[in-house]
From Swiss-Prot:
Annotated GO CC locations: plasma membrane
Organism: Zymomonas mobilis subsp. mobilis (strain ATCC 31821 / ZM4 / CP4)
Stated name of the protein: UPF0060 membrane protein ZMO1566
Bilayer disposition of the protein: Multi-pass membrane protein
Superkingdom per UniProt: Bacteria
A Pfam family it matches: UPF0060
Length: 107
């Protein structure tokens, strides 16, 4: 299912953005930016395969998936597990993304 491409797209974007975070906030080498930029390019390319009917809706749906993946990143990479409010908020976002992507457009 093409909708699953949002997951690797989110992982690529988060990885790319984290490389900048690591460089600036964690004082890592600027060499961290090289794989980060490659990840951001991969993210942009993957998002073009979205099943959404236009770019704006693709980005809106992606936003819901991005939130889930960001919380997973925080938990697994940065050792900060989500609390119950994070999970409730993420569930709302996921429902919203599903509505935007899959609900019929005609009445």
């Amino acid at each position: 299912m093409l909708a699953l491409l949002y997951i690797p797209a989110a992982l690529a974007e988060i990885t790319g953005c984290f490389s900048f975070w690591a460089w600036i906030r964690l004082h890592k080498s600027p060499l961290w930016l090289l794989p980060g930029i490659a990840s951001l390019l991969l993210f942009a390319w993957l998002l073009t395969f979205s099943p959404a009917e236009n770019a704006g809706k693709a980005y809106a749906v992606y936003g819901g998936i991005y939130i889930i993946m960001s919380l997973l990143w925080s938990w697994k990479v940065e050792a900060t597990p989500p609390d119950h409010w994070d999970l409730i908020g993420a569930a709302f976002c996921l429902v919203g993304a599903a509505i935007i992507l899959w609900m019929p457009r005609s009445l």
